Amino acid sequence: MGESKKRPICSSHFMQESRPAALLTLVRHAESMANVDRVLQGVCDAPLSPRGLKQLQQLEDAWRPTSASLNLFDLPKPTLIVTSPIGRAKRTSCAIARGCGINTLPESDTTIFRSAHCEAPQHLAHDTVRADAGLSERHFGTAECTRKMQPVQGYERPPSKELGRAESVTAFYKRAADVGVKWVDWLETYARHNLQDRGSPDSDHQNKAPDTIPHLVLVSHGQWINAFLQQHLPDTWEKADLYYIQSANTSLFTIGLHVTPTSRRLELLRRNDTRHLDETTRPSKRGRRAKPPQRTTLTALWS
């Protein structure tokens, strides 16, 4: 966005503040063999399970446009996709990118969990997935690749020198909070630029479909998504969650970003959305039937 394009944002641009100015979608990675075998893995990685591979295909199909530029999720094409550098998350981001017609993370990308966190890019649509080490799962140190702190055959832990030290709960939550703020700040700035560029106060930009607004997709892990939601959307916590906000593999949390001239607000629009998964790939809690997929229509916000 060049300086010549900047105009004061008229307060009338915010008259319908109930409509999000931008969307943020958090996606958990596909199921890995470690998930199946109940092996603790944070920064270590395991191959995807057969069900995880099927989830990726279903996720890719669900992101493919079905009408205009919307898809099964009734979401606009991402303006930017950012992924954790850990393999299971990268593969999940690739599925989303293929469905959306966006370039996957380049093979030349060398980002790992120990890399410096990436800087937020320019406020424009990006046609290639980016990696951010800040989206990595928590580092569990010597507990990596264990079940109840016991080694598990087939899950060899890298040498301590290579793996490094564990990340404390406090340090992990601070990282998730800081990285979350970075990306929400980026999205807010983009949303405000977008409102500026809509033109005069009597324009019909507020009535346009959601495919016209900025949409950031972050592909990460269960613990990271839990930490983000607890800190940025604490009302998301339900009694059934106990100490952890549950997220199924490849599920989506879609968040609306609302802006006024002096503030911003996040609103959870979709929670743990697995509408793309059929009953054979949507695991349910023991003794309970899986919840049916959500059918919230985001375009209703613009109707």
Where are these regions (language model features)?
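Acidic, low-complexity terminal tails and accessory targeting/binding regions
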Residues: 2-23, 116-120, 131, 138-149, ...
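Active-site signature of alpha/beta-hydrolase-fold catalytic machinery across serine-
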Residues: 95, 227, 231
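Active-site-proximal alpha-helix that buttresses catalytic centers in soluble enzyme cores
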Residues: 2-9, 16-120, 171, 176
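Alpha-helix termini
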Residues: 64-76, 99-124, 184-211, 259-262
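Phosphate-handling substructures
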Residues: 34, 97-186, 302
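GST superfamily/GST-like fold recognition
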Residues: 222-226, 251
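Beta-strand elements within well-structured catalytic alpha/beta cores of enzymes
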Residues: 23-27, 82, 210-220
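Active-site metal-binding loops of divalent metal-dependent hydrolases
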Residues: 30, 222, 274
